[in-house]
Amino acid sequence: MKTEELSDREILDIVRPLAEHTENAWNEKCYSDFVRYFLDEDPAEHFPEEEFNRQIEENYDIYGKHTIADLVAIHRNPDHVIVLWKVDLEKRAEPGLLIYGFRKHNGQILIEGCSYHA
């Protein structure tokens, strides 16, 4: 993903819908939607549905739904971009942190990795 000529707004216009889709899939507890935009050609190999369900079971009751909030930073690399957002957590007053990596693959921008820290 060549980002040199893109503004922060242009980058966010491309990647935020992917992150929002993924967070909504987490909120709906839907594995297939969660991994839909992952770069990994076989997400089940590196992030199997069992691991998704384990994380839901461990964390959902504690934090509830995720809502992407304020932008923290955009880190540009020559071939990919990392975006950090605050994430509002339904069951906690303090926000968490979302970290998403995005990369262009076969003409499409996809999620290289994502995590949240609460």
Regions found by a protein language model. Name each.
Residues 27-41:
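Short, well-ordered alpha-helical segments enriched in acidic and aromatic residues
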Residues 43-55:
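Short, charge-rich amphipathic alpha-helical segments embedded
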